Amino acid sequence: MLSKELLAALNEQMNQEYFAAHAYMAMAAYCDKESYDGFANFYIEQAKEERFHGKKIYDYINDRGEHAILDTIKAPKVEFSSILETFKDSLAQERDVTQRFYNLSELARNDKDYATISFLNWFLDEQVEEESTFETHIDYLTRIGDDCNTLYLYEKELAARSFNEQ
């Protein structure tokens, strides 16, 4: 059985994952509007991954005999000045998520809830990958600058990204 505090925090994180998916779809919409189809695809696939994360938490809560509670998803930011801004915002969002998982892990440790600690370790590993991915994209986009040819090739690479639930 999950403690009330841990259950509330898991429900909050589940909803945060669905918000992240919503935010990534807003970024995809910006990219589509600006005719950056490859970047739009990247964010659509990123949104799928966040929905998968939300569902993973949903399933865990229910598997523990508790009730997953879906909340209202607030409207995400929809205006951006550049592709680089979307990636910087994404990195900030992922860093916030990482901190949330650290806090969840601390709650689980305090509760001596070893099953939840084990469950959360998957997310902590995932967050290392997420932050690294966005840092790499930011570095690359910064180096590209206004080089349209290189940006075009980079976008083509991102157009091939697809999320695989594993």
From Swiss-Prot:
GO terms for biological process: intracellular iron ion homeostasis; iron ion transport. Residues 2-145 form the Ferritin-like diiron domain. It is an enzyme of class 1 (oxidoreductase). InterPro entries: Ferritin, Ferritin-like, Ferritin-like_diiron, Ferritin-like_SF, Ferritin_DPS_dom, Ferritin_prok. PROSITE patterns: FERRITIN_LIKE (PS50905). Keywords: Cytoplasm, Iron, Iron storage, Metal-binding, Oxidoreductase. SUPFAM superfamilies: Ferritin-like. Pfam families: Ferritin. This is Bacterial non-heme ferritin. It comes from Staphylococcus epidermidis (strain ATCC 35984 / DSM 28319 / BCRC 17069 / CCUG 31568 / BM 3577 / RP62A).
